[in-house]
């Protein structure tokens, strides 16, 4: 939250920018003043190996002139520099017109004057560095108590972010937001018989304060994590070249959702804006409303209002309020992730509010919001608890956590690993496996889900390292979901 004097100064600069943009005859313009504070701690074995605590500030000006975008940014927040950046953005827009194929048009948005602050109980930056470092070293010390049994490495981390943003537009919006983010976890590695295997645990990346760093929970999982790493290093390798039933915990499934549902439904990607870098999408607009993306009992919902969600905000970087909507409803592709530009091109009347820029020096683009798998309804014919899925499986594999992954340029054909694997036989877990991967075609995979967990097993998992764009931008989002069971999935090579 900006101080009163700083806010007034920033508002005065914003007013100056908007006046200049209007005077230049632009169809649209906006300005973002941003301050980011990032604090990261890493501990390796018995020492603190990495500590950063830095802050950066600046502003970015975006103009739309005769259907072409122009953008300029600077860290110097003075009237003189602001005037220079507005003029530069206008000149860039004029240059952009020279290679423009079709003019950019935007769907309308109301003007908002509002303030949004992430609800937190404890400011993470109010906690002394020493206390945070001691927590990490305590975790590592306890993991390394299993050194005689074979634990050789311990790593732990804490990460905190605070983002202050003031947005103003030629449409009359003036929005101030303060976002807090917290994240923690650890990993240990066991070594035996010429092999090394790891297990990990995390408090997932969420928009919360230091209250999210539940020390009791973090410390209570240490024994289990260490023992599973030791069991895993001695475990047999997983099967290869077969088909199997998979039961995926939310800690594994969220990444599959991210890669095979999130990215394919980014409308800028569908339209080819990413084709020279990350690729395109199989989920083309001619299939909207007809593509059988998943089984009829599968619903994928976006929700930027989700409490504590990593992508939860008040407004996106175009001043569009947060909202919720389905991208897949009863298995059918029904919508996309849009900003104001792509929504207009699709013929929609409004944006879904997915515009995000990771810095004052970055252009907003369509990013995945909080996007999750809805739980199965109570009493539903395909609803089952994790325990019921296991008990009802004659032979299969249970997967927890994330590992290696790959997916093709159209998000059609993928391969995923995991962090923990257990063999299931006759409805019981009989032991761990290691080095398991599964691969499938996206729509085949989601149509072969025959059981989904209830709301009581819904879990918020997600990522804080989603890369997109050139230059590369990093975004974060939550993929809350429940366990699922999937039939006839290819395992290994």
For the regions a protein language model found, what residue spans apply to each?
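Active-site bordering "gate/hinge" segments
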Residues: 1-324, 329-332, 426-428, 442, ...
């Amino acid at each position: 939250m900006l101080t009163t004097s700083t806010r007034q100064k920033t508002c005065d600069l914003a007013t100056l920018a908007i006046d200049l943009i209007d005077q230049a005859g632009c169809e649209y313009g906006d300005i973002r003043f941003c301050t980011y504070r990032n604090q990261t701690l890493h501990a390796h074995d018995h020492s603190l190996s990495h500590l950063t605590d830095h802050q950066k500030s600046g502003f970015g000006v975006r103009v739309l002139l005769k259907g072409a975008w122009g953008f300029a940014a600077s860290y110097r927040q003075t009237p003189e520099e602001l005037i220079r950046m507005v003029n530069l953005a206008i000149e860039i827009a004029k240059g952009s017109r020279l290679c423009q194929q079709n003019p950019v048009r935007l769907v309308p948005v109301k003007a908002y004057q509002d303030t949004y602050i992430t609800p937190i109980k404890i400011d993470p930056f109010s906690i002394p560095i020493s206390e945070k470092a001691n927590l990490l070293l305590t975790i590592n010390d306890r993991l390394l108590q299993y050194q005689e049994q074979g634990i050789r490495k311990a790593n732990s981390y804490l990460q905190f972010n605070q983002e202050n943003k003031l947005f103003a537009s030629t449409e009359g919006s003036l929005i101030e937001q303060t976002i807090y983010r917290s994240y923690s976890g650890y990993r240990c590695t066991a070594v035996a018989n010429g092999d090394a295997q790891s297990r990990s645990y995390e408090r997932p990346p969420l928009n919360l304060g230091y209250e999210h760093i539940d020390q009791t929970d973090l410390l209570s999982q240490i024994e289990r994590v260490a023992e599973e790493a030791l069991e895993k290093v001695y475990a047999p390798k997983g099967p290869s070249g077969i088909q199997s039933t998979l039961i995926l915990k939310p800690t594994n499934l969220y990444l599959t959702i991210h890669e095979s549902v999130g990215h394919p439904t980014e409308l800028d990607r569908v339209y080819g804006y990413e084709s020279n870098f990350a690729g395109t999408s199989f989920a083309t607009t001619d299939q909207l409303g007809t593509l059988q993306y998943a089984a009829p009992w599968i619903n994928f919902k976006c929700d930027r209002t989700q409490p504590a969600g990593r992508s939860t905000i008040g407004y996106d970087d175009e001043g569009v309020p947060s909202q919720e909507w389905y991208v897949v409803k009863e298995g059918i592709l029904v919508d996309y992730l849009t900003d104001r530009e792509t929504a207009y091109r699709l013929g929609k009347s409004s944006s879904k509010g997915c515009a995000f820029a990771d810095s004052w020096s970055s252009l907003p683009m369509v990013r995945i919001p909080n996007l999750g798998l809805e739980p199965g309804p109570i009493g539903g014919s395909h609803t089952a608890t994790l325990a019921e899925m296991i008990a009802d499986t004659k032979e299969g594999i249970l997967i927890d956590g994330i590992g290696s992954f790959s997916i093709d340029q159209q998000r059609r054909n993928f391969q995923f690993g995991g962090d923990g694997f257990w063999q299931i036989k006759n409805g019981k877990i009989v032991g761990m496996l290691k080095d398991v991967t599964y691969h499938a075609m996206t729509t085949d995979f989601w149509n072969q889900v025959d059981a989904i967990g209830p709301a009581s097993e819904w879990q918020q998992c997600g990522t804080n390292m989603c890369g997109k764009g050139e230059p590369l931008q990093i975004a974060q989002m939550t993929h809350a979901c429940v366990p699922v069971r999937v039939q006839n999935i290819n395992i290994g090579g």
